């Protein structure tokens, strides 16, 4: 009578769920405080997490450890779920320092336990998740569309840049070479014009030096061929002269014959002192032995006969006496040992000097042919206004040396045709 039955007793939490389940190694945890918070429903019980949600459809996934629990704690800032053990790992109980929310980075991270989610809460949460997924899909599709448009624009630029039209031909000329034409190309892309670098620019920068070097090499080859031809001509002239006129040996001093011995002598075959070397010897000896006052050309341009050197041409013997070789630096005297004769200087001195001991380069040069005749040799046709240039001339380039060697060959042949021999009067 008047007694009332008390209210419904709340279902308590099992003692085993008030302790961590060993997901993390917690060292500094106050077990009494944790138990009190779980029993007062301020924290979610420490349930054993499941790896798969197929066992129960009402399990929730923790976004930190990716395990499924019957209930989770809720963040006060963003209402994100988190299990009790992950929360203890994020914010230890013995520290008073504020911790940021791992989801929204809000300072002073704190959670609350609301129990198991209702159906309404689950549907709202699923709807929000669906909206987030759709937004992510739209962003992904937009990114793919932008990438596709970018590739199309790039392909259009490449196709427009490949339309190259030849504008005009640029002609290049080089010395001692034939002219050739290289077409320059121009490509138009939108509003700018660019010239192709391969056919036009590289041709301007590299073609001319390349052809110049090529022409120089060709000229060197031509010079070598000309030198070989001149050498062959020189040796053939030497051989033709040596067939009819045997070559004498070294110079030996002999006594001059008396006038009685001179009379019986008749003009004999011309004795020559051939060149020991070919083209190179002639050039070297000519540069070595020419006197400073000699020149190789007329000062007057009316004469057609070239003058090369005074010691190259034969001299006439007038009045029964030998003429002096005026152009010789030391009044050379030619002596043939087989004939036992010598050429005397105007001063009456006898000389047995050689014309030259040899060129500096090691090539022996015996001198030009010294041919004398007893009044039968014609003199060279000099012009009336002939004058020798006082300047000293030396062939320096290969072309000049070739010209002088050819001139020596012609002068040598001219001297052999007009000479009859060396005879004593």
From Swiss-Prot:
Catalysed reaction equations from the record: S-ubiquitinyl-[E2 ubiquitin-conjugating enzyme]-L-cysteine + [acceptor protein]-L-lysine = [E2 ubiquitin-conjugating enzyme]-L-cysteine + N(6)-ubiquitinyl-[acceptor protein]-L-lysine
Alphabetized GO MF terms: ubiquitin protein ligase activity; zinc ion binding
GO biological process entries: protein ubiquitination; regulation of seed growth
Metal-binding keyword on record: yes
GO CC annotation: cytoplasm
This protein's pathway: Protein modification; protein ubiquitination
Subcellular location: Cytoplasm
Free-text tissue specificity from the UniProt record: Expressed in roots, shoots, leaves, inflorescence meristems, stamens, pistils, spikelet hulls and endosperms 4 days after fertilization.
UniProt EC number: 2.3.2.27
Main location group: cytoplasm
Keyword entries, A-Z: Cytoplasm, Developmental protein, Metal-binding, Transferase, Ubl conjugation pathway, Zinc, Zinc-finger
Superkingdom, natural source: Eukaryota
Zinc finger feature spans (RING-type): 62-105
Keyword Translocase: no
Remaining remarks: Plants silencing GW2 produce grains with increased width, resulting in enhanced grain weight, whereas overexpression of GW2 decreases grain size and weight. The naturally occurring WY3 allele of GW2, which encodes a truncated version of the protein with a 310-amino acid deletion, increases the number of cells of the spikelet hull, resulting in a wider spikelet hull, and subsequently accelerates the grain milk filling rate, resulting in increased grain width, weight and yield.
Function per UniProt: E3 ubiquitin-protein ligase involved in the regulation of grain size. May limit grain width and weight by restricting cell proliferation of the spikelet hull. Possesses E3 ubiquitin-protein ligase activity in vitro.
Protein name, as recorded: E3 ubiquitin-protein ligase GW2
Organism: Oryza sativa subsp. indica (Rice)
Gene transcribed to yield this protein: GW2
């Amino acid at each position: 009578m008047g007694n009332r039955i008390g209210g419904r007793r709340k279902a308590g939490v099992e003692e085993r769920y008030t302790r961590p389940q060993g997901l993390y190694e917690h060292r500094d945890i106050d077990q009494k405080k944790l138990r009190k918070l779980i029993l007062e429903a301020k924290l979610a019980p420490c349930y054993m997490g499941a790896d798969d949600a197929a066992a129960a459809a009402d399990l929730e996934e923790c976004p930190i450890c990716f395990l499924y629990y019957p209930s989770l704690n809720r963040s006060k800032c963003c209402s994100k779920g988190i299990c009790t053990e992950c929360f203890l790992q994020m914010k230890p109980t013995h520290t008073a320092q504020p911790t940021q929310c791992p989801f929204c980075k809000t300072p002073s991270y704190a959670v609350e336990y609301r129990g198991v989610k209702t159906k309404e809460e689950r549907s709202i949460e699923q709807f929000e998740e669906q909206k987030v997924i759709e937004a992510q899909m739209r962003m992904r599709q937009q990114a793919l569309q932008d990438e596709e448009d970018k590739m199309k624009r790039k392909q259009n630029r490449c196709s427009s840049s490949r339309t190259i039209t030849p504008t005009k031909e640029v002609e290049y000329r080089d010395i001692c070479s034939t002219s050739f034409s290289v077409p320059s190309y121009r490509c138009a892309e939108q509003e700018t014009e660019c010239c192709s670098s391969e056919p036009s620019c590289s041709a301007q920068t590299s073609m001319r030096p390349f052809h110049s070097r090529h022409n120089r090499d060709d000229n060197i080859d031509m010079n070598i061929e000309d030198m070989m031809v001149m050498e062959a001509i020189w040796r053939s002239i030497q051989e033709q002269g040596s067939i009819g006129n045997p070559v004498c040996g070294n110079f030996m001093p002999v006594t001059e014959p008396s006038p009685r011995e001179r009379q019986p002598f008749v003009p004999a075959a011309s004795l020559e002192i051939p060149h020991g070397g070919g083209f190179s010897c002639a050039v070297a000896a000519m540069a070595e032995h020419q006197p400073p006052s000699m020149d190789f050309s007329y000062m007057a341009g009316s004469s057609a006969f070239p003058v090369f050197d005074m010691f190259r041409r034969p001299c006439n013997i007038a009045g029964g006496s030998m003429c002096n070789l005026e152009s010789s630096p030391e009044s050379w005297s030619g002596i043939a040992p087989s004939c036992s004769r010598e050429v005397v200087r105007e001063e009456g001195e006898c000389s047995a000097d050689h014309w030259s001991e040899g060129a500096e380069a090691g090539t022996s040069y015996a001198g030009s042919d010294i041919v004398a005749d007893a009044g039968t040799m014609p003199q060279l046709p000099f012009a009336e206004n002939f004058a020798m240039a006082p300047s000293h001339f030396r062939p320096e380039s290969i072309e000049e040396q070739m010209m002088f060697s050819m001139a020596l060959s012609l002068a040598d042949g001219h001297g052999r045709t007009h000479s009859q021999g060396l005879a004593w009067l």
